[in-house]
Amino acid sequence: MNKIYMAGSGGMLGDSFYDVFKGSHDLKCTDVDVNAAWLTYMDFRDLESYRRDVIDFNPDYLFHLGAYTSLEYCENHPDDTYMTNTIAVENAVYIANELNIPLLYISTAGIFDGEKELYDDWDVPNPLGVYARSKFMGERFVIENANRYLVCRAGWMMGSGPNKDKKFIQKLMKQLKDGQTELNIVNDKDGTPTYTVDFARNCKALIADECWGLYNMVCGGETSRLEVTQELLKILGLESSVKIAEVDSSYFSDEYFAARPPNERLVNRKLNLRHQNHMRDWKVALNEYITDYYQDYLK
């Protein structure tokens, strides 16, 4: 059984990777937040500790999953952000190359400036803020220096349910749970959702076929924050009882002050060309996510 070291796997993405790979691989999963029985402590920003822990496990693959993802935190704490999102990725490259094993790194649609209608795998990133720049610097270092790598760009993440999902869907679900009957939703942000379960499964397929390289990896379909909210209310049967108030991004400018691209829509061109696109339509994925993780949440 092949072995995988999963660094920074205590978050929503790590949950799905653990579930998808645990039956077929011997796993060591680490994080600074040890929030599950299958996790042990490791701070991947500490190169020597990270290196020693990985080498002791002697894996066949290194998955570097963790990052700061709050844009506001990143803007306010640039050094901590670059240490976590960029320098730690360089650490992962050094370790993977030393062991001559493939490295998986997770990038983001947020590295683009949003000026184009749709971004494929070969479009040139233009990051707008500290978070986006830190992630792009990590992506670029992997591509330029890792011996073998898989870099997968995610879109608007959803997954892992109310305990670990800190993103858009959970924020909406929390408002509904609190009894909100009117939701203020921006009408000027476009993107593509990414279900963490599908994402982990698609990574597994690429690794099995040794299709190394850089890939956009988002759910099918192009959408917006507004349409995602409308679909969520439809799934929950609340479209007639909860009102959507359309606002532009300036409405939330005090709370969400970090620069965000107006459009983060990705297309999985390389996955399609390699016949490796296993990402489902975002509406199908959203319906499954709500059914599997939020069955009794609003009761």
Regions found by a protein language model. Give the residues of each.
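NAD(P)-dependent short-chain dehydrogenase/reductase
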Residues: 140-191, 197-198
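NAD(P)H-binding glycine-rich loop region in Rossmannoid oxidoreductase-like domains
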Residues: 44-84
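Rossmann-fold cofactor-recognition segment
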Residues: 32-46
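N-terminal Rossmann NAD(P)H-binding glycine-rich loop of SDR-like oxidoreductase domains
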Residues: 3-23
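NAD(P)-cofactor binding segment of oxidoreductase domains
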Residues: 76-104
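Catalytic helix-loop patch of NAD(P)-dependent Rossmann-fold dehydrogenases
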Residues: 83, 87-88, 111-152, 156-158, ...
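Mid/C-terminal beta-alpha module of Rossmann-like enzyme folds, strongest
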Residues: 202-203, 209-256, 297-298
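Amphipathic terminal alpha-helices
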Residues: 281-299
